[in-house]
Amino acid sequence: MERFAAVDDQYDPDAVEDGVFEYWDDVDAYEQTKAHRADGEDYFFVDGPPYTSGAAHMGTTWNKTLKDCYIRYLRMQGYNVTDRPGYDMHGLPIETKVEERLDFENKKDIEQFGEENFIEECKDFAEEQLEGLQTDFQDFGVWMDWDDPYKTVNPEYMEAAWWGFQQAHERDLVEQGQRSINQCPRCETGIANNEVEYHDVGKPSIYVKFPLAEQDGSLVIWTTTPWTIVANTFVAADGDLEYVGVDAEKDGDTERLYLAEACVEDVLKAGRYDDYEVVEELSGEEMVGWAYEHPLAEEVPDHAQGEGSGQVYTADYVEADRTGLVHSAPGHGEEDFERGQELDLEIFCPVGSDGVYTDDAGKYAGTFVRDANDEVIDDLDENGVLLSSEPGHTVREGQCWRCDTDIVRIVTDQWFITVTDIKDELLANIEDSEWYPQWARDNRFRDFVEDAPDWNVSRQRYWGIPIPIWLPEDWSGDMDDAIVVGDREELAERVDQDIDPENVDLHKGTVDDLTITEDSTTYTRVGDVFDVWLDSSVATWGTVNYPEQTEDFEELWPADLIMEAHDQTRGWFWSQLGMSTAATGEIPYKQVLMHGYANMPDGRGMSKSKGVLIDPHEVIEKHGRDPMRLFLLSVTAQGEDMNFSWEETAEMQRRLNILWNVARFPLPYMRADDFDPEETTVEDLRDDLELVDEWVLSRLQSVTEAMTDSMDDFENDKAVDELLEFVVEDVSRFYIQVVRERMWEEEDSASKQAAYATLYRVLESVAALFAPFTPFVAEQVYGALTGDAGHPTVHMCDWPEVDADLHDPALEREIEVVREVEEAGSNARQQAERKLRWPVTRVVVDVDSDDVADAVRAQEAIIADRLNARAVEVVGADDEWGELQYSAEADMSELGPAFGDDAGRVMNALNEARVTEQSLDTLEGTVREALGEDVDLTEEMVEFRRETPEGVTGTEFTALDGGGVVYVDTALTEDIESEGYAREVIRRIQEMRKDLELDIEERIAVDLTIDDERVDSLVREHEALIKEEVRADELDGVEDGHRKTWEVEGTDMEIAIAPCEADQREASEQASGD
């Protein structure tokens, strides 16, 4: 880019971003930036891998934008940042998408299609989606190593999972066992608790009588899952709860029912009983050992009948709710299973992986379990044990996270990493990480880990990392007799078949056929694949291709930083902790940034399937990449959800337009004056810096310090706020306005050079400060300023550091007062309808604080300039402005009771009174003179009103620890009118210059005709000023040119302008030289 080259008048995101993309490609900006930091301190960032199951949405866009922002920031701080992106390419997220594409309904369709064919389809789909995501992320301006992403389907990554699993096995943390799991009947696989999503469903609510076997009466239970009664094994009671036996009457018949005392009324009401009598009181402990008959014994002949089945036991999960007795089926419910294990009871689960009853379910065999609910209820009724049944009871039901099928809980053989054996180690490792926000670690994450069950790592699916366990045919269940393979080299050495470890595909199609024979025993691989969360759990070492390569792992691990949304406390944050602790005993990450979800503007969650979403491509098309990024980064990244806002994104575009205009403003002047930033620096011109230069440079140091602190604390939103306020308020609305006339000076001067050097330093730093947030516009601004003299890209710049020599907080406080005074003065002008172009005779600043008074006195010149005032007067905190008066508004509700019949006279006197201070004593003296007698006034009786002299308006302000009032005297004098009209003419001529798109150096001739002779005379008094400001050689003699009629303060003015001919300009210059 050419230094100080002209740029477009308006910020056009599309044009800027297209140009910068092309520029980055031309100069290899990303590659050069990485090479520039190659010798810096290593920083190991690990990318949480998104599933390659769909296009980028606003959530992934926010996530990748945050990552890109911090990677760029860290590089600018000198770090050599690992930036390898990752993709989660296995598991149900991919499989279900492929099933949809192939119009499959269940696993049977897959088996008919062929496992290997299905695996190939999944591989192709995942790679296809990966390309789309890569394109999207690059299009958002994200800089990562897109040429070398880690893919969970690659052999070197898959063996990273194998290695971790083998390490866990060597620590005796791997076992096969039965557990109650969440089973998706459509996908026919177990899913983890953290993968279950919940929704409200209506279910039957039934009370059932379990007839006692050895005494009269029945136990009463309540359930919303009638289908699980088929597998009932015991009834649970609370040992300390009070239970009763009641004789309940209905239709003339009496039966004995046992239930919790607190539940009697509600249960009998549900059963429509006429009356009851309590005949027995006992505790839950006293009921232990009571035997009962299975309510579906005839329908399910092979029901649970093992030793101890069909009895009452105590359990911790029982509450005094419904009946106080809980039907328990260890073959289904998790708590039921755990209690059944403690009691060494039979685990009876007559349900297959597809949710269909097996032959063990007797009458119900071949029926999908939920479809059997009505039949079970009918049979219970037919058997005389249904006490009550009502439909539509709303409960939270779990469903598969990928296909939305309601899950069933069944007990199956699964492979587990027994994280419960290392719970203390897990909790201790959490303390070795810093979280942003910290409460996410100390509350949400710690609570989840404390309650985490053993990790079911096996899935009965196809597209995943095969579990590397080989077992003998008659395996005893002892893990010492199992072979767990940790990498490809070991696999090649141990299997019976001849394979090439460098090229072997580790997916099911290959490894299922591999056998191991040792000591005359042949081992075959178990058929399951890993839970897909185990894939990503090894990302910190999989990113650096460990164990295949060891050097980077030994130098970099554990990760310095990871960042994802808050759902990953139950997902990736947990799986990494669990796997790493199991494999290595250590936590795999040092810092965690946990952001929220991306929501719709009204707070609803986004959902592609429901058509409720914001497409990032649509945002880019409407507003551009940088405005979208800036909005996303202006939202806190620490734990809170983000509601997308079109309005705020548009506002970010407007603010970047202000940045654009600020950066564009000095370019033509610097170019015209051949300004050399390397030869003319702020340091070289320290003695020539004006006070406003020193202030803006100090503000730059304060902003840099605040932004650095915020970014180091992962508070990017605060950093954005600091930067935007600086550019919009400090630079655009204040500094540029103050300094522009110095840049317009015809002749070179130390003041002009100081202004150039100051603004150059500010803009160069601002470009660097914007770079992590808005990389495109930052690149454009930096290139326009530096050209070939700077780095090839702004992203190679160092992050700005605070220069203590330029930092003057005291001066900043003084200018803060100036700006508050200016704002108040501008408001007072507006009240008086006096434009800023028209000077005023004076501004009076009446303050109530010595600090504010000192600041105003120190900066009188700037205040006068900013408010276009001929003079500034300061009235100190202990003084009164002698020209100010106060009137008193009387409150008759207070005067009446105090003065009776004289209240009217007192009120009239008060209304006429004028005093010079807000003092009751002074007011009483004035009223005494009017009435000829003393009056005693209170604060409640009157309210003082400030009255300014004619032509003076005032506005209050606050600054530092005080404030005051700014009074503007707008009284007109002939001199003020003369300058005011001249400024109006100047503004019109400047607009006409813009119409002709004249270069700032191009001189013109002006023809001015004013209808009003007096106004014409006033304007002519400032001909020299007009000519200087608009670069006019003369104010007469334009025959053609650009001509316009203006109305100025009620007076018509005809103005014509035309560029001067070269010879005319030369003649003019020669004449002026003579």
Swiss-Prot record:
Coiled coil ranges: none
Pfam families the record matches: Anticodon_1, DUF5915, tRNA-synt_1
Chain positions of motif 'KMSKS' region: 605-609
UniProt keyword annotations, A-Z: Aminoacyl-tRNA synthetase, ATP-binding, Cytoplasm, Ligase, Metal-binding, Nucleotide-binding, Protein biosynthesis, Zinc
CDD domains, alphabetized: Anticodon_Ia_Ile_ABEc, IleRS_core
Motif placement: 'HIGH' region: 50-60
Cellular component terms (Gene Ontology): cytoplasm
GO BP term, pick one: isoleucyl-tRNA aminoacylation
Binding-site list for ATP: K608
Covalent S-S links between cysteines: none
EC number: 6.1.1.5
Record's subcellular location: Cytoplasm
Cofactor(s) of this protein: Zn(2+)
Main location: cytoplasm
Protein's UniProt keywords contain Cytoplasm: yes
InterPro entries linked to this entry: aa-tRNA-synth_Ia, Anticodon_Ile_ABEc, Ile-tRNA-ligase, Ile-tRNA-ligase_type2, M/V/L/I-tRNA-synth_anticd-bd, Rossmann-like_a/b/a_fold, tRNAsynth_Ia_anticodon-bd, Val/Leu/Ile-tRNA-synth_edit
Catalytic activity: tRNA(Ile) + L-isoleucine + ATP = L-isoleucyl-tRNA(Ile) + AMP + diphosphate
GO function terms (MF aspect): aminoacyl-tRNA deacylase activity; ATP binding; isoleucine-tRNA ligase activity; tRNA binding; zinc ion binding
Free-text domain note: IleRS has two distinct active sites: one for aminoacylation and one for editing. The misactivated valine is translocated from the active site to the editing site, which sterically excludes the correctly activated isoleucine. The single editing site contains two valyl binding pockets, one specific for each substrate (Val-AMP or Val-tRNA(Ile)).
Function: Catalyzes the attachment of isoleucine to tRNA(Ile). As IleRS can inadvertently accommodate and process structurally similar amino acids such as valine, to avoid such errors it has two additional distinct tRNA(Ile)-dependent editing activities. One activity is designated as 'pretransfer' editing and involves the hydrolysis of activated Val-AMP. The other activity is designated 'posttransfer' editing and involves deacylation of mischarged Val-tRNA(Ile).
Quaternary organization: Monomer.
Protein name as catalogued: Isoleucine--tRNA ligase
UniProt source species: Haloarcula marismortui (strain ATCC 43049 / DSM 3752 / JCM 8966 / VKM B-1809)
